[in-house]
Amino acid sequence: MGVAYIFYNTGIRRRTDMKVGFIGGGNMASAMIGGMIQKGVVSADDILVSVRTEKSVERLTNQFGVQATTENEAVVAGSDLVFLAVKPNQIKNIINLVKNFISPEKIIVSILPGKSLQWLGTEIGKPTKLIRTMPNTPALVGEGMTGVCANDLVTEEELQLVLTLLKSFGRAEVVPEYLM
């Protein structure tokens, strides 16, 4: 499948053939989703979010017009790129639930503090395209600064795509993982 890019007057390009998933729909995920939609990087129709409660499903659907569910597996299965946006103490159980749905071409992006690329790779248990990010709280108002690092399976084009998504709610820079 080819990749089509559309350039908007914001200077951000949009990949039109991609589904973006979020496991977790709290404050940071909501800031990211809002920025991506507002900047036109991803349409609401192309965003899938899994959350723990039906109340959160309703909130995200009403607030952003995204597809929301309580099924983490459905988000991973239906997305090309998945943001892990949950609390660090929840991630091990979530990975165990969804790892069978992670295929070699999927990109997994973590916003979890304290969980290295190596740790994530070990938990998933198979070669996976992994990107680790560290967004900060000004992202909640579109002024964030996000540190980014990736494993060797992520191509330069894929890394640039993720940087484009992250820049929709502030700035993003590639840094060595030890600085994160």
What are the roles of these predicted feature ranges?
Residues V20-F22, V82, V109, V162:
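Hydrophobic packing within well-folded, soluble alpha/beta domains
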Residues E54, Q63-F64, N72-A77, L81-V148:
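Rossmann-like NAD(P)(H) cofactor-binding subdomain of soluble oxidoreductases
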Residues W119-K129, M145-M180:
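Internal alpha-helical scaffold of NAD(P)-dependent oxidoreductase catalytic cores
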